[in-house]
């Protein structure tokens, strides 16, 4: 029971000290800080628009009303960007597939050449010169 009282009393004391320190720092704001806050308010007003302007900006236009030029340009830029990304993706896929097919074709040609060469060596009877020396077109 005494530990609970000690913990409760120390947390209450810490809370009171924090409140007093916060009030002390807020009361000691100098003229420089006040001027800086005034400048910051001016900057905020330049950055942020009025609430009425913001609500008008965010209102959706009617379905039948024509799109503004900015909307059309933004949609066209987005569409062109999507087309370019799609084109790059399919080009990359096509290149990978062409490389794969070329490797498969090379492997198949190598296997076929080896099989034909083995067949010729097995069936060579010694009466004729070997195939390599008997080619018509070199």
UniProtKB/Swiss-Prot annotation:
Extract the ranges annotated as region (Disordered): 58-78
Keyword check for Secreted: yes
Per the UniProt entry, the propeptide covers 28-64
* Principal subcellular localisation of the protein: secreted
Q: Which GO terms describe its molecular function?
A: BMP binding
Q: Where is the signal peptide?
A: 1-27
UniProt xrefs under Pfam families: UCMA (PF17085)
The alphabetized list of GO BP terms reads: negative regulation of osteoblast differentiation; negative regulation of SMAD protein signal transduction; osteoblast differentiation
Composition bias type Basic and acidic residues, residue spans? 67-78
Q: What is one term from the GO cellular component aspect held by the record? A: perinuclear region of cytoplasm
Residue spans making up a coiled coil are: 78-122
Tissue expression as described in the entry: Predominantly expressed in resting chondrocytes.
**Modification note:** Proteolytically cleaved by a furin-like convertase to generate a persistent C-terminal fragment found in almost the entire cartilage matrix, and affecting osteoblast differentiation.
| Induction record | Expression inhibited by TGFB1, and weakly inhibited by BMP2.
Q: Which UniProt keywords apply?
A: Coiled coil, Cytoplasm, Cytoskeleton, Extracellular matrix, Golgi apparatus, Secreted, Signal, Sulfation
**Nucleus keyword on record:** no
Q: Where in the cell is it found?
A: Secreted, Extracellular space, Extracellular matrix
Q: Which domain of life is it from?
A: Eukaryota
**PANTHER family documented for this protein:** UNIQUE CARTILAGE MATRIX-ASSOCIATED PROTEIN (PTHR28647:SF2)
UniProt similarity note: Belongs to the UCMA family.
State its role: May be involved in the negative control of osteogenic differentiation of osteochondrogenic precursor cells in peripheral zones of fetal cartilage and at the cartilage-bone interface.
Q: What is this protein called?
A: Unique cartilage matrix-associated protein
Species name for this entry?
Answer: Mus musculus
Gene label: Ucma
